[in-house]
Amino acid sequence: MSGISDPVSNYMAQLRNAQEAEQTYVDIPASKLKRAMTQILLEKGYIKNFVNIDDEKQGLLRVYLKYDEYDQPAIRMLERVSRPGRREYADSDNLPEVKNGLGIVILSTSRGVMSDKEARRFGVGGEVLAKVF
């Protein structure tokens, strides 16, 4: 173990594991970044909903997972791109696409956390946090 913690990778692993276990929801330690990423997942239809829960500490995000009529998770792929040891950035002209635009890329930009489509609209680049399909 390297000793470097990566809260975003932990967040994504918790979502994946909860989906594999076909859970209705998962409670994840909250942060501004995770809240922003979860809001994007909600807006793009990858989760049902989420709520903030006060636990007298940092708080929790209760993320309600979404499944189709065949009990398949709405999130088919959730992949971390930029990591603490290897940051990856893209400018507005070179933003990656997921599955020819069917998926999304989540970026941390100077204007906040947003999807690749929003970043293109605003003409900004940033750190490529994750790919979702």
UniProtKB/Swiss-Prot annotation:
Does the keyword Ribonucleoprotein feature in the UniProt annotation?
yes
Annotated signal peptide: none
Q: What GO CC terms are in its UniProt record?
A: ribonucleoprotein complex; ribosome
In terms of InterPro entries, this protein maps to:
Ribosomal_uS8 (IPR000630), Ribosomal_uS8_CS (IPR047863), Ribosomal_uS8_sf (IPR035987)
- This protein's UniProt keywords: Ribonucleoprotein, Ribosomal protein, RNA-binding, rRNA-binding
Molecular functions (GO terms): rRNA binding; structural constituent of ribosome
One GO BP on record is: translation
Query: Could you tell me which PROSITE patterns the record lists for this protein?
Result: RIBOSOMAL_S8
The reply on keyword RNA-binding is yes
- Membership in a protein family: Belongs to the universal ribosomal protein uS8 family.
Q: Which HAMAP family match?
A: Ribosomal_uS8_B
Give the quaternary structure: Part of the 30S ribosomal subunit. Contacts proteins S5 and S12.
The role this protein plays is:
One of the primary rRNA binding proteins, it binds directly to 16S rRNA central domain where it helps coordinate assembly of the platform of the 30S subunit.
What PANTHER family has UniProt attached to this entry?
40S RIBOSOMAL PROTEIN S15A
Name of protein? Small ribosomal subunit protein uS8
Q: Which organism is it from?
A: Salinibacter ruber (strain DSM 13855 / M31)
Gene name linked to the record: rpsH
